């Protein structure tokens, strides 16, 4: 049974699942879908285009599917699609896509802390943590099991791979390859995210091979092209090696924290 406060505004066309709690002063527009078991706290705003899965907990003052902060947007219908089992804390803003029928996507089982901003057309993976006051610009992709610590900034159109750790206050201005730790401003490579790799069941041998790959990239004083060739030859084959090589190739060897004079070939 749903518990919907009489002091909340819920558009009659909004689709609300079962066992949903909607507290006073929540504002829910039309063209909204909210899955089973969600809990929406006071003063949250769920705007047109929100597609929210099951068992999400949305705290006070958050705005889901805010209109995109993008001069290209001309009022087209677009969406925010959120998976299941996420916690979205106070005053989080998630903008919908700036493209017709496009979507900003949030996966499942993530924790988005207070005052975080997620721009238009972002894709946030599963099991992510975004710390307090993280700012993610438009068209950013964040991989699974990645942590962005408080006050981290991610520039538009940057991709952050799986199982990364971006430390507090770090400014990400290029693509961050998977399994790495980045810190500071300007951004610096600080090793691999071995703690979370162990948490998700990666073996010590696998972790050592990941570390070996990134020694070629960040500690060999060679170009990213040569580092890629060395990784292909020297590192044992594994899904993680494949993911690293694919990321480097997909981003044309342009990755964060590599000195400009060592980029490319």
Question: Residue locations for each model-derived region?
Answer:
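Structural signal for interior beta-strand "rungs" in well-ordered beta-sheet cores
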Residues: 3-183, 187-188
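Terminal amphipathic alpha-helical/low-complexity segments used for targeting or macromolecular assembly
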Residues: 1-7, 12-13, 18-19, 55, ...
């Amino acid at each position: 049974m749903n518990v919907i406060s009489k002091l909340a505004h819920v558009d009659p066309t909004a689709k609300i699942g079962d066992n949903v709690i909607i507290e006073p002063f929540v504002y829910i527009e039309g063209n909204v879908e909210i899955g089973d078991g969600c809990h929406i706290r006071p003063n949250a705003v769920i705007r047109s285009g929100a597609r929210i899965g099951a068992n999400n907990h949305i705290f006070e003052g958050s705005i889901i599917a805010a209109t995109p902060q993008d001069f290209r947007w001309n009022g087209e219908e677009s969406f925010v699609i959120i998976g299941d089992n996420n916690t979205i804390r106070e005053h989080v803003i998630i903008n919908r896509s700036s493209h017709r029928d496009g979507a900003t996507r949030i996966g499942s089982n993530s924790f988005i802390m207070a005052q975080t901003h997620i721009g238009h057309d972002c894709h946030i993976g599963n099991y992510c943590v975004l710390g307090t006051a993280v700012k993610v610009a438009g068209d950013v992709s964040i991989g699974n099991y990645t942590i962005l610590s408080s006050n981290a900034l991610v520039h538009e159109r940057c991709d952050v791979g799986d199982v990364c750790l971006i430390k507090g206050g770090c400014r990400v201005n290029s693509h961050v390859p998977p399994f790495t730790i980045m810190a500071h401003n300007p951004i610096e490579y600080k090793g691999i995210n071995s703690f979370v790799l162990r948490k998700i069941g990666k073996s010590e041998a696998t972790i050592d091979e990941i570390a070996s790959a990134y020694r070629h990239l960040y500690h060999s004083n060679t170009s990213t092209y040569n580092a890629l060739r060395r990784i292909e030859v020297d590192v044992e084959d594994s899904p993680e090696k494949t993911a690293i090589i694919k990321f480097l190739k997909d981003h044309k060897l342009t990755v964060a924290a590599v000195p400009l004079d060592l980029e490319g070939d």
